[in-house]
Structures are given as structure tokens and as C-alpha cells.
């Protein structure tokens, strides 16, 4: 049976084993247990968990500090160097913003919120530091929005909107887009809000076609309107606007193949269609530039398992 810490590595919850040698021989049972597509069925987009593996994953998740954790989150050097040109004159606020953005990309939303809040503490006038919290508290392809976070998201959105006059045009566009994601009406239609946000982000992407982060943020907004449902049964016809998300991500990869979120989202987008398309993206993530974002380290396993690269799949899941 997989223990909770090895199980945690499979889905990218902060476990890191630096090395192992010699290369092990894996049984058929081990390969099945570590099959990312099987685990994805349990957790990535699923709404139930009933296996011992699932229970171990839940135990491991309990070790992750919630967004409300009182202690400041530390800076991780590999997460503090995003090229996103956030408007702040406080160096550590910039580093925490970068960390929050990369943790958001790596689906560690609780860690992202804590990072953005530390950036806010360091620079109360950083509009994008509040924008980041509003983004990280929203729904994602693996989980719906927790209604307990709605007020915090609204507060962060309001603060970002109030401060946006000193931001760059691109930052203002992102802030105004996230304002379409939330409503003060608790009975509002979440699907409609997600569609509004995707529409707004597509407009931002059209205004700033050369920005890679805008492109991937837009792609994810589109993906959230149809989570884990991007292809028709023929595996060739895209569902809804999923094709637009694929186009945006492929555009980023064509000019910046090392962009971690472009590689991450591309795996999610095409694994159920033609996983070979994302094999190069998987190989790039398998040599991580942000090893502290454990979910990103795990992601190549989705493709490797489908491509028959079982040893590689196991390697990245216990990295």
C-alpha cells in the first residue's frame, strides 16, 4: 500500500524525495497504483474517493496549511522569479507575487493565497497582489469554488479594483476581467460567472496577444467553463471553446516552450485526445524549473502512462 507521503507526491502535495538508485523493477500492481490516469479519475475532476489510495491522499492533504494559516509562508527561491512585470517597488512583494502566481499555476491554491497575502502585507498598494488572491480563490478544473471563500474573493477583487488606477493597462485589464468572475448575490449562477470571466479574458488576450501569462490565464479561464471535458467522443472535435484554449497554449509553446503553465495546461488539454501531442511538454516539465511546485513535477506522468513510459511516470511521481 502506498503511504500518505508517497501518495502525496503523485498529485503534487509538497513531498520531495531527491533521488533513488538503482532503477527499480515495478510490478504490474505498482504500475496500476501509480497510473496517473487512474488517480485523475479519483481526484482530478472526480467528486468522490473510496479507495485506500484516496484515503492516503486525503491524509497527505491535511498536512497542507490552509490559506488562513497565521504564519507567513516562506519564499521558495525557485518560485520567486516569475518574469511577470508586476507593478510594485517592493522587491519582496514582487517575489511573493511571483510565488503566488506559480503556485496558482501549480494548483496549490492555498499556498498561492498565502503568498499573495504576504505580498499585500509588504505593499498594500499593489493592486495585482489583491488580483492574485481573487484569482486563486476561484474555481479550477479540479474543484468548484468553496462558497466559504466568496467574501474573501470579493474583498480582494474590490481592493484590486480600487487600486487599479496606478497599474499598467494590461494589469487593469486583468483586474477588470476578474471582477466579472464574482457576484455579491449568493444565488448567482456560477457557470454563467465562469463564462463571463472567460469572455472577459478572451478580450484581454486579444488586446495583449504577445503576453504569455495573459494567454495561459485566458486558456485556464476557458477550461474552467468545461472542466475535464474538452473533446467529443471522436477525440478530435473540441467541446465548446476548448479549441480556443488549445490555440492559446500552443501559441505560447511555439514562442516560449519553457513556460511551465503552458506545458501544464497542454497536458490537461490533449491527454484525452492525442497524448503524443503533449509528450514534448511532459519532457520539459520532467526537468522542472520550479521543483517546489510539486503538482507540476507530477504532471508528465499523465502523458508518460498513456504513452507506455511507465518507469518515467513513476520517476516523476516520486521525484
Language-model regions, residue ranges each:
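Bacterial N-terminal signal peptides
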Residues: 4-19
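N-terminal alpha-helical interaction modules that lie
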Residues: 19-266, 271-275, 279-290, 306-319
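Sequence context surrounding c-type heme c attachment/ligation sites in exported
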Residues: 294
Amino acid at each position: 500500500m502506498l503511504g500518505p507521503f508517497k501518495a502525496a507526491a503523485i498529485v503534487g502535495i509538497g513531498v520531495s524525495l531527491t533521488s533513488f538508485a538503482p532503477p527499480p523493477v515495478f510490478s504490474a500492481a505498482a504500475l496500476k497504483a501509480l497510473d496517473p490516469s487512474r488517480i485523475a479519475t479519483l481526484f482530478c475532476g472526480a467528486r468522490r474517493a473510496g479507495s485506500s489510495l484516496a484515503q492516503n491522499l486525503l491524509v497527505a492533504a491535511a498536512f497542507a496549511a490552509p490559506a488562513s494559516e497565521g504564519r507567513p509562508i516562506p519564499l521558495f527561491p525557485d518560485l520567486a522569479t516569475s518574469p511577470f512585470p508586476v507593478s510594485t517597488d517592493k522587491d519582496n512583494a514582487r517575489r511573493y507575487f511571483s510565488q503566488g502566481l506559480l503556485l496558482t499555476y501549480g494548483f496549490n491554491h492555498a499556498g498561492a493565497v498565502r503568498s499573495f497575502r504576504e505580498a499585500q502585507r509588504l505593499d498594500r498598494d499593489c493592486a495585482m497582489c489583491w488580483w492574485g488572491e481573487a484569482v486563486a480563490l476561484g474555481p479550477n478544473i479540479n474543484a468548484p469554488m468553496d462558497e466559504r471563500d466568496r467574501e474573501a474573493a470579493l474583498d480582494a477583487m474590490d481592493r484590486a479594483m480600487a487600486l487599479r488606477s496606478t497599474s499598467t493597462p494590461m494589469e487593469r485589464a486583468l483586474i477588470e476581467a476578474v471582477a466579472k468572475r464574482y457576484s455579491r448575490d449568493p444565488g448567482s449562477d456560477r457557470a454563467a460567472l465562469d463564462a463571463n470571466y472567460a469572455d472577459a479574458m478572451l478580450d484581454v488576450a486579444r488586446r495583449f496577444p504577445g503576453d504569455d501569462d495573459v494567454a495561459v490565464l485566458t486558456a485556464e479561464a476557458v477550461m474552467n467553463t468545461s472542466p475535464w471535458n474538452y473533446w467529443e467522443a471522436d477525440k478530435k472535435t473540441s467541446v465548446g471553446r476548448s479549441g480556443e484554449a488549445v490555440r492559446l497554449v500552443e501559441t505560447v509553446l511555439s514562442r516560449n516552450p519553457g513556460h511551465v503553465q503552458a506545458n501544464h495546461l497542454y497536458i490537461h488539454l490533449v491527454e484525452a485526445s492525442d497524448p503524443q501531442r503533449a509528450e514534448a511538454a511532459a519532457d520539459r516539465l520532467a526537468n522542472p524549473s520550479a521543483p517546489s511546485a510539486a503538482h507540476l513535477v507530477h504532471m508528465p506522468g499523465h502523458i508518460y502512462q498513456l504513452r507506455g513510459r511507465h518507469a518515467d511516470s513513476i520517476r516523476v511521481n516520486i521525484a
